[in-house]
Amino acid sequence: MLKAAVIGLQWGDEGKGKVVTYLSRRYDCVVRYSGGSNAGHTVDYGNFKMVHHLLPSADIKKQKMMYIGPGVVVDLDVLLEEIDQINNLIPESRSLLRISKQAHVVIPIYRDLDEKIDSSRANQIGTTRRGIGISYANRAMRCGLRLEDFETPARAESFLNEISRTWSIKFDVKMILDSLIEKYNKIRDLLIDSSEAVRVLKEKDLLFEGTQGVLLDVDMGTYPYVTSTNCSTTGIQPGFGYPVQVDKIFGVMKAYTTRVGEGPFPTELKDEVGENLRRLGSEYGATTRRPRRCGWLDLVLIKYAIETSACNALIMTKADILSGFEKIPICMGYKIGGKFYTQINNTAHLTEIEPVYEEIKGWKSLHSKEFDDFIYKIERELGLKFAYISTGPKIEEITEL
């Protein structure tokens, strides 16, 4: 059985959603294994667009299965809205979805706590403030609610009371519980025990959909300016709920770099060029609509992401956005304390470095020699080949190499 993963090699927003939808046609099921509604995967079907915050980005037109694993935290409001969307677009597509009963639930009060905590920091992280970090914190403290807890309302109520005590906050437990149970009942028929899901799925071809990117991974990313989970390949097994051997790991990278929120960004452009990239690439967060910070491609960080994720195939997106630039700078290394480095072992000192660029000739067309030279140069530097090049926003605008 085929097992593959699609992960981001930067700070998220690499275009993974479109890639997953395209690749899903070769697999039986797409699995979301981490994160929550802080993700935002935009899929352009041509006649309509869909932004997946929780639902896996499977091609629903091709009737591909979707599974939300126990490593995901579920906002029931967002989930119900997305289920309605896909069902309106493709009738009966709801039946393609299964959700782990062991997935934790984001309750409304988490969003308020998330905002309060981030606002009180001396150096704000810049979270999406959707309660994701609070959900994972409560899971670690063993007081978080799981979907299966609503099968026994008294059990769910006890967890809500524990949350109130743990965070020293008061809220109407009965009102929140009644609201959550009402929403839970709307998806009850889609729930499945993680162990049962594994029995069903382990004999199928699976595509694991990563969220955010390696540089936002809670352990391997630019800590503390990271998300709350292992969104790289290290999160697949716990997020799926079963040991699984992933054979193909597709690493998705933009032809340039973007970042939402705070944190170090060595190649950031704080000038008109950066603004131009943002405009041309429509670089605004799919979840928050915040403007993304933009900069040149950073091969040092890409190498780090490849190494820490065991990526073995590359996919480039948004190369078309750079068409028309006369020169394209690529960050080939860093100067740190007067010394030159082409690789780093961690991300702790990115604020202390000076990026070193090499300029290459730009291109007017993705069919030009100049663009081919750009691709070959990156392949040589990274020691990996590109499997696909995305040539536009629509699903079909992708070339297999």
UniProtKB/Swiss-Prot annotation:
The EC number(s) given in the record are 6.3.4.4
What Gene Ontology biological process does one annotation of this record name? IMP metabolic process
| UniProt xrefs under InterPro entries | Adenylosuccin_syn_GTP-bd, Adenylosuccinate_synth_dom1, Adenylosuccinate_synth_dom2, Adenylosuccinate_synth_dom3, Adenylosuccinate_synthetase, P-loop_NTPase
Q: Which cofactor does it need?
A: Mg(2+)
Q: Where does IMP bind?
A: D13, E14, G15, K16, N38, A39, G40, H41, T128, R142, Q212, T227, R290
Q: What Pfam families does this protein's entry cite?
A: Adenylsucc_synt
Family matches, as PROSITE patterns:
ADENYLOSUCCIN_SYN_1
Q: Where do the annotations place Mg(2+) binding?
A: D13, G40
- Positions of GTP binding: 12-18, 40-42, 292, 318-320, 390-392
Q: In which pathway does it act?
A: Purine metabolism; AMP biosynthesis via de novo pathway; AMP from IMP: step 1/2
Q: Which UniProt keywords apply?
A: Cytoplasm, GTP-binding, Ligase, Magnesium, Metal-binding, Nucleotide-binding, Purine biosynthesis
Q: What class of enzyme is it?
A: ligase
Indicate which residues the UniProt annotation says bind substrate. Answer: A286, T287, T288, R289, R290, P291, R292
* Cofactor: binding comment: Binds 1 Mg(2+) ion per subunit.
Active site positions, chain numbering: D13 (proton acceptor), H41 (proton donor)
Q: Which domain of life is it from?
A: Bacteria
Q: Which family does it belong to?
A: Belongs to the adenylosuccinate synthetase family.
Protein name in the entry: Adenylosuccinate synthetase
